[in-house]
């Protein structure tokens, strides 16, 4: 069921009712109902308005013992920001430190449907390289222009402490919430084009048009 189904699995893998998940503004609004359905609570870290990298001062204040997961979306919808290597490294360092302090793993859930949609040499680092306890949620809707096919996956970092258990739990969660496999024909088709994308240049063209128009209107924009 695409990244939506992947996120639904990830939230259930790592939380119980009453636990908290932190995410960063601005964010995809459907995160709220996805988390609400698990009984967990989504809390939103206010943005760094200068460049939309993580507001670490606010983040560390909100990272309490009740937090069981941190949800990031990079490249981000709707801001377009790509979290830099220094940002991800600092985030990972904080999560390791707080996991040790609180005596439980704080998982990092990385929502990555826009992973390939970066332009002008911008680096989009692989989140799981920075933090072992990462769960990655992906959709082919954007990279292959297949939004109606609902095809994606949830991947657990092999270095994650509970990787083996979590993979098995995903099957049980699928049965419990009705997110069964997409049709086999689209799974087989996507498997043949894992190293390819649709023509993404139209997105770059649209980006440049919007950027120019916003500047002409007097807005300050980060590109």
Model-derived features with residue positions:
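Hydrophobic "anchor" residues on beta-strands that sit immediately upstream
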Residues: 69, 107-108, 135
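Short loop/edge segments at beta-strand edges and connector loops
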Residues: 1, 110, 138
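Structural signal for conserved beta-strand scaffold positions within catalytic alpha/beta enzyme cores
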Residues: 44-46, 136-138, 223
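Conserved Walker B
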Residues: 112-114
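A structural motif corresponding to the C-terminal end of an alpha-helix
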Residues: 97-106, 213, 217
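Conserved core of the PLP fold type I
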Residues: 1-103, 116-130
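Conserved core segment of the aminotransferase class I/II
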Residues: 133-204, 208-219
């Amino acid at each position: 069921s695409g990244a939506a189904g992947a996120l639904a699995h990830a939230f259930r893998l790592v939380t119980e009712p009453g636990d908290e998940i932190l995410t960063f503004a601005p964010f995809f609004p459907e995160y709220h109902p996805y988390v609400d359905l698990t009984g967990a609570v989504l809390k939103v870290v206010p943005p760094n308005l200068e460049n939309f990298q993580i507001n670490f001062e606010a983040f560390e204040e909100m990272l309490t013992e009740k937090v069981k997961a941190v949800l990031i979306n990079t490249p981000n919808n709707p801001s377009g920001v790509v979290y830099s290597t220094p940002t991800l490294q600092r985030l990972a360092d904080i999560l390791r430190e707080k996991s040790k302090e609180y005596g439980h793993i704080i998982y990092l859930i990385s929502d990555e449907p826009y992973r390939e949609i970066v332009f002008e040499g911008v680096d989009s680092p692989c989140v799981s390289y920075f933090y072992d306890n990462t769960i990655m949620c992906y959709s082919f809707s954007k990279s292959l222009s297949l939004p109606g096919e609902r095809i994606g996956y949830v991947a657990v970092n092999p270095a994650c402490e509970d990787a083996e258990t979590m993979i098995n739990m995903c099957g049980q969660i699928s049965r419990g919430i009705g997110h069964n496999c997409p049709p086999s024909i689209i799974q087989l088709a996507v498997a043949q084009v894992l190293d390819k994308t649709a023509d993404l240049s139209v997105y770059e063209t649209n980006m440049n048009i919007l950027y120019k128009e916003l500047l002409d209107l007097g807005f300050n924009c980060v590109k």
